[in-house]
Amino acid sequence: MAGLWKTFVLVVALAVVSCEALRQLRYEEIVDRAIEAYNQGRQGRPLFRLLSATPPSSQNPATNIPLQFRIKETECTSTQERQPKDCDFLEDGEERNCTGKFFRRRQSTSLTLTCDRDCSREDTQETSFNDKQDVSEKEKFEDVPPHIRNIYEDAKYDIIGNILKNF
């Protein structure tokens, strides 16, 4: 009878473990894993935290799950033993738009993630090229010794000649 109980407990334990392994992750959990993986590569630099996420319209566990979310720098650095969720955002912290795919099949998972800077937030500085003086080719090389000038000119014409040979 004791052997039957041990077998029963073993079967129940295996069933629980297999159910947990096959449990479908929620989108929020996948995004948390993606941010955790992104922050692991930032030794000594500020950690990023979730700002907003856009879940996919449908989630099929047999296919790639598209990821789309925004993250922002926090006050915590990766050397500290703190979770980014416990950290405040930096006031002028960098924001990034992240896209990727999460794929899970049986026991293997795959995550592809790209986080690009949010250029729409950055202030653009317009520079006028009219303010700069137009410097001629000869004026650029007035202070350069003649031997160096000749080497430069020869290299310039060799490069142009090689480019034109390809056409």
Curated annotation (Swiss-Prot):
Pfam families to which the protein is assigned, alphabetical: Cathelicidins
Q: Which residue intervals make up region (Disordered)?
A: 122-141
Kindly state a single biological-process term from the GO annotations of this entry. negative regulation of angiogenesis
User: Which InterPro entries does this UniProt record tie to the protein?
Assistant: Cathelicidin-like, Cystatin_dom, Cystatin_sf
Molecular function terms from GO: cysteine-type endopeptidase inhibitor activity
Q: Where in the cell is it found?
A: Secreted; Cytoplasmic granule
**Keywords attached to this entry:** Disulfide bond, Protease inhibitor, Secreted, Signal, Thiol protease inhibitor, Tumor suppressor
Keyword Cytoplasm attached: no
Extract the signal peptide range.
1-21
Subunit structure of this chain's protein: Monomer. Homodimer; disulfide-linked.
Family, per entry: Belongs to the cathelicidin family.
Q: What does this protein do?
A: Acts as an inhibitor of cathepsin B (CTSB) activity. Plays a role as a negative regulator of tumor vascular development, cell invasion and metastasis.
What protein name applies here?
Neutrophilic granule protein
Species assigned in the record: Mus musculus (Mouse)
